[in-house]
């Protein structure tokens, strides 16, 4: 049976996984009375085996889920807490029987912004139910065609349900259907191939296991080393051309996600693409993880031969959008997939809101947001560049992690908190220099790192967690403004330029140390390196001017409007030392 009945919405979202469900909820929370449809071939009560890469959140993704989507209580009650990231390198690759056989960068305290591990099947099942309760309409079917008309013309999505075919129309279409690439294929919007992805050429094998004996990993007793759990962190293990994750995704069933990202030119697909080969790889190279695997019950095994891809356009002038795996992914390292989703979700909501309201600058926002999101995804691509050569070198990789953490906590996290990624004026100034750093300083650091790996240089283990590595008790997730303490959570209340000023300065110090320890005086005095050092200091100075300007322009604004309103109201407070009667109510 077929029907040509037309069903109309403001936004149709193809795909009801993490990206699509977060997008739907964010739209409904921020645009009153918006009509949203979700389409997915998976049933509402999807099974617990409906799992995929991406179970660990970092700060920006956690802020999206907990703050922007209002799900903090839900996360506390339903998903494991995350105690930061740990990094492990074998002391001797031939001896990896226990965690003591590794060098470590342990997280030693709870980071300031809470993060979580996610059981994706449960999260998506629960969030779909919440979205339906908020008014979203769910179609359990498969998209068979989408007519992407130009501009503001209505788009039509043809959906095959169980016993009928329907057509759904909307002005805005979001592809969150993952690797089906519904829009990507139709518009030739996808970019594959390591030659166009900064050399990233990786695959992934992973298992879900339950009833794990976690004491094989760690006893949980480390009183002199940490104030947080080692097990409930995301643990990373490294070796030549690969890294592994170990993520607890369910407390009751003691379930773990355990997987590897491997680079094909070091570890060919044919050597690791089955459960047996993956198990043998663990036994030979990370025996402690093999023992953990043997202690458990297998839930499932997966292999993905090609991880990395990106899109040419993320937000089209023709009112279509790609988000999540439908848009891009490069690697699971640093768990940045959900971060790219978070920034894209908020960008899409603001574009849709502006266009539905017929705001004059709606198209300008779309263009600026598209440029920034492409630049941000390119930065994630850049963070994965040259991994195949550097992952297994404990010294060089630890310095690299420190370097990348500095940008994350010093610039990107405060940018998200202050909603600067939604400020077109700021983005126009930021995106160009951001790309300059990606194509200049980052490339130089990674090329120098390759030289140091080839020479077998030991520069020491750079600990991204501790405050004794640079000058002035600096540590990477230190923030330089009181945006958390004084809840500067409204748009542009936190001063992004403060974070940028300090980050540029400390990166300059890191860069000088890196050159000195790696190359000596020749490294310090090399003209290219002097230029990079000078440019960092110049950007720090320019950011200081931006900091002063922003402080001046916002001098009359309170840090937080709700707190200011309460303080004004409190001026009328008078103590009343009298209880209200209650016994009479009982009688």
Model region roles, listed by residue range:
Residues 46, 130-287, 345:
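Predominantly flavin-linked oxidoreductase catalytic cores and closely associated redox partners
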Residues 107-129, 267-273:
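Short beta-strand to alpha-helix junction loop
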Residues 28-53:
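Glycine-rich FAD pyrophosphate-binding loop
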Residues 352-587:
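C-terminal helical "tail/cap" subdomain of flavin- and related membrane-associated enzymes
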Residues 4-19, 37:
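Beta1/beta-strand and adjacent pyrophosphate-binding region of the FAD-binding site
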Residues 240-242, 248-252, 264-388:
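FAD/FMN-dependent oxidoreductases across multiple families
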Residues 14, 175, 322:
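Redox-cofactor binding/interface segments in oxidoreductases and associated redox assembly factors
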Residues 46-95:
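N-terminal FAD cofactor-binding segment of flavoenzymes
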